[in-house]
């Protein structure tokens, strides 16, 4: 498949998880979403959902690739996964074309995933599980207090 930074952005994957992903780890759900069985740090497996619109691109690109094939195959080295370097090059090029942060990387997209999910109301525990963090403190780095906001707004008062 042609690599798409969208998978990283919506999945919050680490680069090692991305380049190690095989078709055996991509499961089509009835909803049209893709469920990724991601092998993270310490060989811990977690499930990450990819929205249907991006999942459709994934499934359409598979062709007759066997379950053991990398999802993101190298064009220069068929049968092998993209390298970390190639993935970050693609992310930087896409960021340049989109006019966003020229320092973009897979880690930057992972950070953006966490920050935007939390800002849009996702529970920090869910974000932590999605990212594969063993400690909630790690995820809390991505939670930013916004000017003009106060936790008092979330308390029930009479």
Predicted regions and their residues:
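Conserved tyrosine-mediated DNA breakage-rejoining catalytic core shared by Y-recombinases
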Residues: 16, 20-58
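Catalytic-site neighborhood detector that most strongly recognizes the C-terminal catalytic loop/helix
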Residues: 42, 131-156
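Short coil/turn motifs that cap or connect alpha-helices
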Residues: 14, 22-24, 101, 123, ...
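Active-site/catalytic core of tyrosine-dependent DNA strand-transfer enzymes
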Residues: 51-101
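Ser/Thr-centric signal marking residues that sit
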Residues: 83, 105, 115, 138-139
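Basic, Lys/Arg- and aromatic-enriched nucleic-acid-binding interface segment
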Residues: 1-15, 19, 44, 64
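Short alpha-helical segment immediately N-terminal to, or the first helix within
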Residues: 7-8, 21, 116-117, 130
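Short, basic (Lys/Arg/His-rich) helix/loop patches that form interaction surfaces
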Residues: 48, 67, 88-129, 144
């Amino acid at each position: 498949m042609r690599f798409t930074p969208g998978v990283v952005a919506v999945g919050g994957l680490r680069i090692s998880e991305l380049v190690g992903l095989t078709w055996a780890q991509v499961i089509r759900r009835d909803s049209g979403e893709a469920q990724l069985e991601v092998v993270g740090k310490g060989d811990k497996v977690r499930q990450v959902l990819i929205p249907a619109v991006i999942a459709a691109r994934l499934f359409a690109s598979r062709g007759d690739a066997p379950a053991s094939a990398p999802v993101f195959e190298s064009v220069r080295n068929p049968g092998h996964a993209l390298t970390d370097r190639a993935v970050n090059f693609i992310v930087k090029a896409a960021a340049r074309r989109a006019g966003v942060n020229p320092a973009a990387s897979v880690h930057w997209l992972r950070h953006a995933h966490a920050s935007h999910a939390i800002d849009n109301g996702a529970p920090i525990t869910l974000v932590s599980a999605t990212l594969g963090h063993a400690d909630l403190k790690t995820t809390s780095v991505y939670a930013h207090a916004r000017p003009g906001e106060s936790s008092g707004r979330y308390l029930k008062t009479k």
